[in-house]
């Protein structure tokens, strides 16, 4: 489903517009799609993003855009004009400006634009919510399996520069910044074939990891004036309408791309040692103590060696850390600060899915139902799945029309309640009627969003003290070596003769 159907090209800044036929007699709501792909891959041309079924069924206008990804869209040398970073996000903003100026010509209503996206696309939607110049270009937002506060979604300016200079080194370009020239660095990168840059991107990551990407948005003080967490905490979201959600097994897809013992070609029944190693890959850049806390929380201590339980636990670690708990945190903060929020968990595994059963409902596999792919007669979906896809398209279109996914013509049917910070109500989306639940993986998310930050904060001073002690020790050690060398040199000299 994710395989590219076009050649790699730097000539990529296009958008697509679908309009219902016959054309509506009055302006119709507009849905604008941003694809995911970890900010390193993706294209609006993928078959799964075909908008014809959604548009014809719900008579909305649908727009999808391309934006630059990887180093082409997110390489950053903060402080330089040549590569300021976040140009992929600026591509998206430009598309939103185009929609405001032109969508009326396609029957769309520029005063009723809903921005929706999945994974990195959802994180992008969130960043536009947090960036004032973007905020006025759309009116509602849908974030599917991603959030701007995810640990993978942004980097700081220092790390962004390190990655840029590392890529330059890998392709034989001079370093920028201190001791170098950013203009020369960027000019050199422009002489390298696009495929050479793509082939070297993954080598700039600081350590082995899953669900981490080389070139992502940077907290630059411009597009993002502060970290997403700080902007979410400080924001005023009164009047905003947001739909957020996750799939049942967010982590499983990523494990087959680098976690020890995992493969899409077998049952991935891992050992305890592989689980422990997998935690370090799944939660990179944390201290040993924090990793131990993750292991403690996710181990089933009645069956600590059971391979299937360990496999499921590591899937939960990766999914909770990167998707579920950032989304839950975002939903709670937005709701507490005045937004009207609706939340879901997508729990249906498609009958056509080729991934092994142990992967459950993987990351990204709600999209085909949102876009109505089961209505394509050439596909082999079941009748129940076609009905399910029609339901989901109606929910998304209702939200685009009114800010409420519920069916206004059926007030006695199952109702989707708003998500609040207190009640934390969400719905399960599968072939059955809506089921309302409470607490989106509340225990796990209390660990990630409450306990672990406090643990890291409490141990930061210890870590800093240890770093200072080590620095002083190494300085003292080097002095001792120098003194010993000087003493040895002196002791070998001829002694002064008696005067």
Residue ranges, per PLM feature:
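Mobile gating loops/cap/lid regions near enzyme active sites that modulate substrate access
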Residues: 292, 296, 315-316, 324-499
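Serine-hydrolase-like catalytic core of hydrolytic proteins
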Residues: 2-182, 191, 222-257, 339
């Amino acid at each position: 489903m994710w395989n590219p159907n076009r050649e790699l090209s730097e000539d990529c800044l296009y958008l697509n517009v679908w309009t219902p036929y016959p054309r509506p007699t009055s302006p119709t709501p507009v849905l604008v799609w941003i694809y995911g792909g970890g900010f390193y891959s993706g294209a609006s041309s993928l078959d799964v993003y075909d908008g014809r079924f959604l548009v014809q069924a719900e008579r909305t206008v649908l727009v999808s855009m391309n934006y630059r990804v990887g180093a082409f869209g997110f390489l950053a040398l903060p402080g330089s004009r040549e590569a300021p970073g976040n140009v992929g996000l600026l591509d998206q903003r430009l598309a939103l400006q185009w929609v405001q100026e032109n969508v009326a010509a396609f029957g769309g209503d520029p005063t009723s634009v809903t921005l929706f996206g999945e994974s990195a696309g959802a994180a992008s939607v969130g960043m536009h919510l947090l960036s004032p110049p973007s905020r006025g270009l759309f009116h509602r937002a849908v974030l599917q399996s991603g959030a701007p506060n995810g640990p993978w979604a942004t980097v700081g300016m220092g790390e962004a520069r390190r990655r840029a200079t590392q890529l330059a080194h890998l392709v034989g370009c001079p370093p920028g910044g201190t001791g170098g020239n950013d203009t020369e660095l960027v000019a050199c990168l422009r002489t390298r074939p696009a495929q050479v840059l793509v082939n070297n991107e993954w080598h700039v990551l600081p350590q082995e990891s899953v669900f981490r990407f080389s070139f992502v948005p940077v907290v630059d003080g411009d597009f993002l004036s502060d970290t997403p967490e700080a902007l979410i905490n400080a924001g005023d979201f009164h009047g905003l309408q947001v739909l957020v959600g996750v799939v049942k097994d967010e982590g499983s897809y990523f494990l087959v791309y680098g976690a020890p013992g995992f493969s899409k070609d077998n049952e991935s029944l891992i050992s305890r040692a592989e689980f422990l190693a997998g935690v370090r890959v799944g939660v990179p850049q944390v201290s040993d103590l924090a990793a131990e806390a993750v292991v403690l929380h996710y181990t089933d201590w009645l069956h600590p060696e059971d391979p299937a339980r360990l496999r499921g636990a590591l899937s939960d670690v990766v999914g909770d850390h990167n998707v579920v708990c950032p989304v839950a945190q975002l939903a709670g903060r937005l709701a507490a600060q005045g937004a009207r929020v609706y939340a879901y968990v997508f729990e249906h595994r498609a009958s056509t899915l080729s991934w092994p059963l142990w992967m459950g409902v993987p990351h990204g596999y709600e999209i085909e139902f949102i876009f109505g792919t089961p209505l394509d007669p050439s596909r082999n979906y079941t009748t129940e799945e076609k009905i399910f896809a029609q339901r989901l398209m109606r929910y998304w279109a209702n939200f685009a029309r009114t800010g409420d996914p519920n069916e206004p013509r059926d007030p006695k049917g199952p109702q989707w309640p708003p998500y609040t910070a207190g009640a934390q109500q969400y719905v399960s989306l599968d072939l059955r009627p809506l089921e309302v639940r409470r607490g989106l993986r509340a225990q796990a998310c209390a660990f990630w969003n409450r306990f672990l930050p406090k643990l890291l904060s409490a141990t930061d001073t210890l870590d800093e003290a240890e770093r200072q002690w080590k620095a002083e020790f190494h300085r003292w050690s080097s002095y001792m070596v120098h003194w010993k060398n000087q003493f040895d040199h002196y002791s070998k000299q001829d002694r002064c003769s008696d005067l």
